[in-house]
Swiss-Prot record:
Its cofactor is FAD. PANTHER family: APOPTOSIS-INDUCING FACTOR 1, FERROPTOSIS SUPPRESSOR PROTEIN 1. It holds the Pfam family Pyr_redox_2. GO terms for molecular function: electron-transferring-flavoprotein dehydrogenase activity; flavin adenine dinucleotide binding. This is Apoptosis-inducing factor homolog B. Putative FAD-dependent oxidoreductase. FAD binds at residues 12-16, 47, 292. GO terms for cellular component: cytoplasm. Keywords: FAD, Flavoprotein, Oxidoreductase. The keyword Iron does not apply. Belongs to the FAD-dependent oxidoreductase family.
Length: 387
């Protein structure tokens, strides 16, 4: 007689949640709770806003991911050390819990939650693309990785012609250098030169104040109104900017609402869960956290979320076999490692504090495909949501 499989409950079906579910599916009774009906490959969103047909490939159905486990599509409103409560009243218990709630940023760089049908989703990206096409001047608020990748996609789609700018693009960034202050000088110089080559005006150490309606969009992960409207903006330091279109790439927020009540003693000031190197939430043997909602001092990337998932999956498997905590797999926290696409043919990848890979290597690693086919394969090649 075989023993009943242990129950693993995973809250969140993003990069980390999908990976840990897939790895544990054959050995455990796996349940994934996710508020979206499909996986959103956010890495590809920067290209989908200028090539909206790509939406058909970055919204990936979950139906082929698990052979044994199941998905529950709903919103978790409360997570405790013993159960998870859903908005519809369901209560789910577990033997092992994986919190993979991720983070919010503004659509279209995270899925706009109010766009539920395939036609709504496609129309949203088509409209976004049309507004970019029509705009003569674009203001990008924020100068992180998403902003630099987005600008590069726009310029690739609408390049300089006859020595005249098709579009004037301005980046306003609160930091002292683009992408992230932890990047080495070579990386930063390549990005700065790439923006200059693309005739992008970069304003550093300054801000555009975020309006209340944009803050509400961020809180609810809904889409800001994207519409051509010639406006005059002023930075906090008084720099005037005229733009037909404003795109916000700032405001990443940890999705902590569901767990903050019961885990308040192990949450940092950013709402992230404090974890050990086996991805266990501090003080809890059977509760794990992975991805953006962890307090690991490293970049919050799809790659790192997947790496955390592998660590957590190995740890859960080991615990189920009676192994002690000191025998569990351990995460090696990475330094500032990042692959940045600068359009389909260009980019730079920092692989250590002192070393970078150049344009050709980055093109092959990321820029050419933005990992789109990789994640379709990762979810076991389901039939596209949007035909």
């Amino acid at each position: 007689m075989t023993s009943e499989k242990k129950r693993v409950l995973i809250i969140g079906g993003g990069y980390g949640g999908c990976e840990v579910a897939k790895q544990l599916d054959s050995k455990f009774n796996v349940t994934v709770v996710e508020r979206k009906q499909t996986f959103f490959h956010s890495v590809g969103s920067v290209r989908a806003v200028v090539e909206p047909e790509l939406v058909k490939k970055i919204y990936i159905p979950y139906d082929k991911l698990l052979k044994n486990g199941k998905f529950i599509f709903g919103t978790v409103i409360e997570i405790s050390p013993t159960l998870a409560k859903l908005e519809d009243g369901q209560e789910l218990t577990f033997d092992y819990l994986v919190i993979a709630t991720g983070s919010n940023s503004l659509a279209p760089f995270k899925a706009p939650l109010e766009k539920k049908s395939s036609s709504e989703i496609l129309n949203y990206f088509q409209n976004f693309s049309q507004q970019i096409k029509q705009a003569k001047s674009i203001l990008i608020v924020g100068g992180g990785a998403v902003a630099c990748e987005l600008v590069s996609e726009i310029v690739e789609k609408y390049p300089v012609k006859d020595s005249e700018l098709v579009k004037k693009i301005t980046i306003v960034h609160s930091g002292s250098k683009l992408v992230n202050p932890k990047m080495n000088d070579k990386f930063t110089n390549v990005v700065s030169k790439a923006m200059k080559k693309r005739n992008v005006e970069v304003i550093l150490n300054d801000r555009i104040t975020m309006p209340d309606e944009i803050k509400a969009n961020l809180l609810n992960q809904t889409s800001p109104n994207i519409q051509i409207s010639s406006q005059n903006y002023t930075t906090e330091k008084g720099v005037p900017i005229q733009a037909d279109l404003i795109i916000w790439t700032v405001g990443i927020k940890t999705n902590s609402e569901s767990y903050q009540s019961h885990f308040s003693n192990v949450i940092n000031e950013s709402g992230q869960l404090k974890v050990n190197l086996s991805c266990q939430v501090q003080g809890y043997n059977n509760v794990f956290a992975i991805g953006d909602c962890t307090d690991f001092d490293e970049f919050k990337t799809a790659y790192n979320a997947g790496y955390h998932a592998a660590i957590a999956a190995k740890a859960i498997d080991a615990l189920s076999k009676g192994k002690s905590n000191d025998k569990l797999a351990k995460h090696k926290v990475s330094g500032p490692i990042l692959s940045l696409s600068l359009g389909p043919q260009d980019g730079i990848t920092q692989i250590s504090p002192t070393m970078c890979l150049g344009s050709f290597a980055t093109k092959m690693i990321k820029s050419k495909s933005l990992f789109i086919d990789r994640y379709i394969s990762q979810l076991n090649n389901p039939k596209p949501l949007i035909q």
